[in-house]
Amino acid sequence: MSSTLGVMLKELNPALSVQLFEVTEKPAQEASNGWNNAGTGHAGICELSYTPNQEEDGTVDVSKAISVFEDFEHSLQFWAHTARRGIIKDTRKCLNSLPHISLVHTQEQVPYLKARYEGLKKHHFFEPMRFSTDRKEIADWAPLLMKGRNEAQPVAATHMDGGTDVNFGEISRSFCQWIDEQENCRTQFGHRVVDLNKKTSGKGWIVTVRNEKTCQKQKIHADFVFVGAGGGSLPLLQKSGIPEVSGYGGFPIGGQWMISRNPKVVAKHTAKVYGQALGAAPTMAVPHLDTRMIDGKQSLLFGPFAAWTGKFLHNGGSHFDLPLSVRPGNILSLMRVGMHNLDLVKYLVEQGLQSKESRMRELRNFYPDARADDWEVIDAGIRVQAIKQDPGEEPGIVHYGTEVLTSADKTISALLGASPGASVSTQVMLECIQRCLPQFLESDEAKERMS
């Protein structure tokens, strides 16, 4: 998100000074890292979490899926622009076209998927989508889904070509490198922002940055600050003291994947296949079986498996992140998370204690013939879900999705939340510019660039 905003602002106003600080020693080591996310270009095609409910009349509200599709198209257009400009050097390293498939395998889920398909087909975005309960046709789409499956088990799937596998880490690295090469711009790794203080006169901020190797601190004067620190955004916002952050808390959710690098297995699956979340599973734990292309190598990924953690960042975080984020303004919300989300807390604990064989049983819902020897468990990234109190709601509701929090004077903005996240980074950052820095969109040159 931060590198996307940096590129957009520098493209709109080449004279602008941009500085980017990152606590890790290299770019894209947290949520953007290829193995810390599923790499799904979230377009609402296969992700059933955007259309979770079937109404009493049998229909499914597909408006969220349509909105996500449109936002992802904006990202594709921006990435195409940056490729033409030479900012992204090789799109094959970060963007690969793959079919997106939704799979259900219970009697209750089949009518839901059919209704979802019928709702989506009415919109031109999803005209190419196909629905099937024919086992042979589904096997043609993704052979591993059907091999060894009980013939008596109900099954249905939707299929659509033109989905995307995205290496967000590669895009982030390309953007950071380009920013660092521009005049009046700099990216500094191994530097942690430790404090944010509002200027005593005029608008803007004094940003205190610490070199993690030397412990030397420097102060940067900035007219505008964007906090795109993933799970670390909330503690930084709290340091800023802006009233808008009062009442917000963070609920970290760790994750793990099962991956297969066996060429014989990997070669039989070329798609991203999403199912439905089970029980109290959070949105980020919707199970999926995915082809991944990272560093030119193809592999197969299944998960995610969630876990309890106190850390807000995978590499740059501490197990004290959660307790240190407690403030008088959010303690009630945090305390009530447990009261309102007992099933979720229980789910996270159970997931963290799962054996490999237990995980294999979940995998076999997608790939019935899966062999344990072909799979290994690796750590995934950490998502920090926003906790807040909305008008009319009880405190302590876990909010899923991507949200931008902005100060009243528009001098600081931050990204909170997770999915669809990086997939809609272009739209989210454009809205941030429109809200906080509209002057950069007013010139004829800027309007032409954005058209």
Residue ranges and their predicted role:
Residues 63, 67-76, 104-111, 158-178, ...:
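Short beta-strand to alpha-helix junction loop
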Residues 90-97, 103-177, 182, 186-188, ...:
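Flavin (FAD/FMN) cofactor-binding and adjacent substrate-gating region
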